[in-house]
């Protein structure tokens, strides 16, 4: 049996409903990647730091409430307090990561000008709180669609379909790229880039398109 068949059947069922929402979100991503300021890019990087072990919805809410200026200017203590008020599970550590990442402001446009694999490796090395999944999330959210965001929900779907043997408890580059290749096969069958296919899967799971 085709291991992708069950997932593809589900995706085809929701494709028509999800498409206008996905296209709207994709336009936001392309606009941010092509004309976003360093500060806007840093806000998106901070969003990706926040969503790790939390939720996209929570990250969107925090990004809106704290704002670009808050991510750039608030003290670590004040940022931690704000994140705590917003219900983040790890407010102190995430505030620390965001503050430590401020050295990347004025370098992010250069980083995203590299190929996606090179930009991803650089972000994993230089940014606090940014691993393989989070760096892929950031790059997708600025319109680089060839990367896959291997979130636990995506991994669960791949595992249940028999596409992967187990769900990793942590990531090495080799392991991430190996499973990303499986996801890329799924995306190719669906007819969309990996970063776009992810949004359709999230619509299939949640009935909405976040980021």
Give, region by region, the residue ranges found by the protein language model.
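C-terminal accessory module of base-excision DNA glycosylases/AP lyases that mediates lesion recognition
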Residues: 1-31, 95-98, 102, 113-124, ...
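Structure-specific DNA junction-binding interface
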Residues: 1-86
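Alpha-helical structural elements of signaling/regulatory helical domains
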Residues: 54, 89, 189-192
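Alpha-helical ds-nucleic-acid-binding substructure associated with the helix-hairpin-helix region
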Residues: 63-128
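Alpha-helix N-cap and coil->helix boundary residues
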Residues: 57-61, 74, 78, 93, ...
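Hydrophobic (often cysteine-bearing) scaffold residues that line and stabilize catalytic clefts
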Residues: 38, 42, 55, 94, ...
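Short alpha-helix boundary/capping elements
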Residues: 50-58, 70-71, 106, 146, ...
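Short amphipathic alpha-helical interaction patches enriched in hydrophobic/aromatic residues
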Residues: 49, 83, 87, 142, ...
